[in-house]
A protein has these predicted regions:
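Extracellular interaction modules
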Residues: 1-3
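A structural boundary/capping signal
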Residues: 5-111
């Protein structure tokens, strides 16, 4: 079973922005790309870093580092220490515009 703690450890050097961006281009319907900040786990405990995932209804889809993590949003936010005020949300049409403009997968508006 894939554990969220393992995902958060790997994403510090992972492919989360690309994986989430690619997932958004494949999905149909109403989904949201999120660029946010998460708390590190394990070796990264005590550190916050940028991360990307996709939300659909009340589920987070985190396909970074070859994983296919799909968990309830409340659980993901609780374990990752995600705060809505730290996140940037992009509707279905926005990511492609940002990718073409910035020429990278993100983050685009986070410093």
């Amino acid at each position: 079973m894939i554990k969220l703690n393992n995902i958060l450890l790997e994403v510090a050097t992972g492919d989360c922005y690309q994986a989430a961006g690619r997932l958004m281009t494949k999905l149909r319907g109403d989904h949201t790309l999120v660029h946010g900040m998460v708390n590190g786990q394990g070796a990264l405990e005590g550190k916050r870093f940028g991360h990307a995932w996709v939300e659909t209804n009340d589920t987070v889809l985190d396909h970074s580092n070859g994983k296919k993590l799909e968990v309830p949003k409340d659980l993901y936010y609780a374990i990752g220490g995600c705060r809505k005020e730290d996140n940037k949300y992009y509707n279905t049409d926005e990511p492609l515009k940002w990718i073409l403009k910035a020429k990278h997968w993100g983050p685009w508006e986070m410093s």
